[in-house]
């Protein structure tokens, strides 16, 4: 079993890379891919860069060059659930674009033309994540809708509009749906694991800078615990 792990920023992958053994590195199109062992599994970890285009490029290269059995997207997100605090975790129940609108042609808001409205993670990866939750201690984790767009959300007016479009949204970020869409195209199972760095409000820029390291650590810890729960025979 080989697992691809994608984070956008250095704090989102640093703890994973530090915990790897037998690591080797290759750079393709300016993106570093580090192959090795983590939590007893063969993994390839990469820092994609921020945003949907960067994430799509990294995911495509990862799948084409390394042929992972599954892909995990890790990192930070803005939170939309009152019961969650900064540092808590959202596991994707589904992933959608929040900044796509081709409704004029009969598609749902957030649905890219010729694509599903929502990208659904592999049940066995979500199951492994839920098992890992029990080992997180004081960190709270839930399953929920994660939405993606090429904007850092810190405007209450925009937050209100997003919640009108996606009332069950638990978190938003800038890469997950792009990674999910590429995985969908290639038929590769995926899951998105995000730790909250802010609450998508006026304080978000300050909160993000203050808490990105904490969010990156919690998300990385969750990924490592998830890897420990994975049964090589469960890949499907």
Curated annotation (Swiss-Prot):
Molecular function per GO: adenosylhomocysteine nucleosidase activity; methylthioadenosine nucleosidase activity
Active site: 12, 198
Stated name of the protein: 5'-methylthioadenosine/S-adenosylhomocysteine nucleosidase
GO cellular component: cytosol
Family recorded in the similarity comment: Belongs to the PNP/UDP phosphorylase family. MtnN subfamily.
Domain of life: Bacteria
Binding residues annotated for substrate, in chain numbering: 78, 153, 174-175
Gene name, Swiss-Prot/TrEMBL: mtnN
Keyword RNA-binding: no
HAMAP family: Salvage_MtnN
Key words of the record: Amino-acid biosynthesis, Hydrolase, Methionine biosynthesis
Entry function: Catalyzes the irreversible cleavage of the glycosidic bond in both 5'-methylthioadenosine (MTA) and S-adenosylhomocysteine (SAH/AdoHcy) to adenine and the corresponding thioribose, 5'-methylthioribose and S-ribosylhomocysteine, respectively. Also cleaves 5'-deoxyadenosine, a toxic by-product of radical S-adenosylmethionine (SAM) enzymes, into 5-deoxyribose and adenine.
GO terms of biological process kind: L-methionine salvage from methylthioadenosine; L-methionine salvage from S-adenosylmethionine; nucleoside catabolic process
UniProt EC number: 3.2.2.9
InterPro entries in UniProt: MTA_SAH_Nsdase, Nucleoside_phosphorylase_d, Nucleoside_phosphorylase_sf
Enzyme class: hydrolase
Pathways involved: Amino-acid biosynthesis; L-methionine biosynthesis via salvage pathway; S-methyl-5-thio-alpha-D-ribose 1-phosphate from S-methyl-5'-thioadenosine (hydrolase route): step 1/2
Gene3D superfamilies: Nucleoside phosphorylase domain
Catalytic reaction list: S-adenosyl-L-homocysteine + H2O = S-(5-deoxy-D-ribos-5-yl)-L-homocysteine + adenine; S-methyl-5'-thioadenosine + H2O = 5-(methylsulfanyl)-D-ribose + adenine; 5'-deoxyadenosine + H2O = 5-deoxy-D-ribose + adenine
């Amino acid at each position: 079993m080989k697992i691809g792990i994608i984070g956008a920023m250095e704090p989102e992958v640093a703890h994973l890379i530090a915990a790897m053994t037998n690591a080797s590195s290759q750079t393709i199109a300016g993106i570093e891919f580090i192959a090795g062992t983590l939590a007893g599994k063969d993994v390839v970890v990469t820092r994609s860069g921020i945003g949907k285009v960067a994430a799509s490029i990294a995911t495509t290269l990862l799948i084409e060059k390394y042929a992972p059995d599954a892909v995990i997207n890790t990192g930070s997100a803005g939170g939309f659930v009152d019961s969650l605090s900064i540092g808590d975790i959202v596991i994707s129940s589904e992933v959608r674009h929040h900044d796509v609108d081709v409704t004029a042609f009969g598609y749902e808001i957030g649905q890219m033309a010729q694509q599903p409205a929502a990208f659904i993670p592999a049940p066995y990866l979500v199951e492994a994540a839920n098992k890992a939750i029990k080992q997180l201690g004081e960190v709270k984790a839930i399953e929920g809708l994660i939405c993606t767009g090429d904007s850092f959300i810190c405007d209450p007016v925009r937050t209100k509009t997003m919640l009108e479009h996606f009332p069950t949204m638990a978190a938003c970020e800038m890469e997950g749906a792009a990674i999910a869409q590429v995985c969908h195209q290639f038929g590769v199972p995926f899951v998105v694991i995000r730790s909250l760095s802010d609450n998508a409000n006026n304080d978000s820029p300050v909160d993000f800078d203050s808490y990105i390291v904490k969010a990156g650590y919690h998300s990385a810890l969750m990924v490592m615990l998830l890897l420990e729960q994975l049964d090589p025979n469960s890949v499907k």
